[in-house]
Amino acid sequence: MGLAGHRLPPGSARLEPYQNWLLHDAFYSPPGPEPHPVAAFVLANRGIGISLADLFRLFGSEIDDGPLLAESSIELHRPLAEDADYEVRGVVESVERRRSRRIGPFDRITCRFDLFSGGAPAATVTNVFAIPREPKGRGAVWTEERGTSDEGRQHLKSGPEASGGEIRVDPARMKTLALLLADPNPIHLDAAAARRLGVADRPVNQGPSTMAIAANMVLAAFPGARLVSLRTRLLGLVLAGDSVEGGGSVVDREILDGQERVRCQVHLDVPGRDRVLEGEAVLVLPASDNR
């Protein structure tokens, strides 16, 4: 495609206090002055100087062709702040032609978005898109094989002790997030659009919302910790009304620059269906945490 190395138009983004409150609500997170870690995804999506629809057109695809977010990673170099200006720069890092038994031929396109505040790096968001090269709607059935579970490690899970109760995906919050993301994809808003594309019979939850649920789980397991890295693979669709459950394990602890860091493997499931997310989170523990 000749896109690898292509630099995207730069731009800027800002999260106003009221938008920060709305984003916390859309991400099933208690409101607070510090933005949710996955707000970096939102700032990158809104701040890059090209719309999401035009980005997919650059890839030779339309929204209705079923482009999907397959993977996403967020690296936070410093805590995000509301009411702050962020410069956003982006580049297409790689393009790979692949084939799946489920969606046929597709292009795996990796884009990196760098956020700067006051000229200093603030966050890096790397998104991997699956762009189907079959007729419209084929890409919507994207799934990947889940990884193996690992036992015998410190266990994390969603539920009352980790996330304040069961998470049920709310279509109203999906609409709020569509506005905050400037995401025009109708499958997040309209069940008829999802059916028309052969996706599902209900609206489809946005990838960053599913990522935020995973982030909430690990943050609840370590009160007062700060999430500095979240790497996820989105394995299946989460639909409006779904109940989402999660779990994970602590796989490593280290002292870096005088701070204790915990690395966790995480996953999310929709009961009765396949696993929908697997990933890894790194948290910096508060100095008073003696676990």
Residue map of PLM features:
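Generic signature of intrinsically disordered, low-complexity segments enriched in small/polar residues
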Residues: W21-P31, A44, R89, I109-R112, ...
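Catalytic-pocket segment enriched in acidic/His residues
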Residues: R202, S209-R253, P271
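Hot-dog-fold acyl-thioester-processing enzymes
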Residues: M1-E71, K136-R226, N290-R291
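Small beta-barrel nucleic-acid-binding modules, principally OB-folds
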Residues: D64-P79, R226-G236
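Residue-level signal for alpha-helical context at structural boundaries
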Residues: R108, A191-R195, T232
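HotDog/MaoC-like acyl-thioester-processing domains
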Residues: M1, E71, L76-E166, L237-R291
